[in-house]
From Swiss-Prot:
Keywords: Carbohydrate metabolism, Decarboxylase, Lyase, Magnesium, Metal-binding
Family matches, as Gene3D superfamilies: Aldolase class I (3.20.20.70)
Entry's Gene Ontology molecular function annotations: 3-dehydro-L-gulonate-6-phosphate decarboxylase activity; magnesium ion binding; orotidine-5'-phosphate decarboxylase activity
Induction: Induced by L-ascorbate. Repressed by UlaR.
The protein, known as: 3-keto-L-gulonate-6-phosphate decarboxylase UlaD
Cofactor(s) named in the record: Mg(2+)
Organism superkingdom: Bacteria
Gene of this entry: ulaD
Organism the protein comes from: Salmonella typhi
InterPro entries assigned: 3-keto-L-gulonate6Pdecase_UlaD, Aldolase_TIM, HPS/KGPDC, OMPdeCOase_dom, RibuloseP-bd_barrel
Tagged with keyword Lyase: yes
PANTHER family, A to Z: 3-KETO-L-GULONATE-6-PHOSPHATE DECARBOXYLASE SGBH-RELATED (PTHR35039:SF3)
Amino acid sequence: MSLPMLQVALDNQTMDSAYETTRLIAEEVDIIEVGTILCVGEGVRAVRDLKALYPHKIVLADAKIADAGKILSRMCFEANADWVTVICCADINTAKGALDVAKEFNGDVQIELTGYWTWEQAQQWRDAGIQQVVYHRSCDAQAAGVAWGEADITAIKRLSDMGFKVTVTGGLALEDLPLFKGIPIHVFIAGRSIRDAESPVEAARQFKRSIAQLWG
């Protein structure tokens, strides 16, 4: 089982605040996510600028595409994104369109499982050639005190068994990682737990050490 990668979510409102994070921890993570908030605040230039600064890193545009899959994904890939996200409620043809464009750029598409989705949809994504999903505990669920539970673990295992590469996100803390031991997680996303730490560098390194211990 390969080691899960570590992704930092830049859910900043401005490039200046995003740079404050990347200057510290870009070399400690595998994937730099241009979060939805930053995509809206700064547009695709955020993707272009971060990829120019860190060409050796995977840069994800978390656009959460809901429609116009080909147009929006092309905008992201032409800005040199490696991956883009499509929201789970999007029509299957939106996901297919985004994937077609991704292939032109040797990129990839992730289905963001935020909100309601079904296992029937999941099978449609697999049948369409989608390989990646993001299992998401929403900000609102976190704020309501909803913790990771057995239902989450069961769903993640089932997605993995279907052949998906699963990314896990949603207020992920260091102490949550052992919950997922034994599951071939593709990526763990940490946002505030790294960005807002007293030492973001040490926080990122702690995540990497824990991942190596649990999956190594």
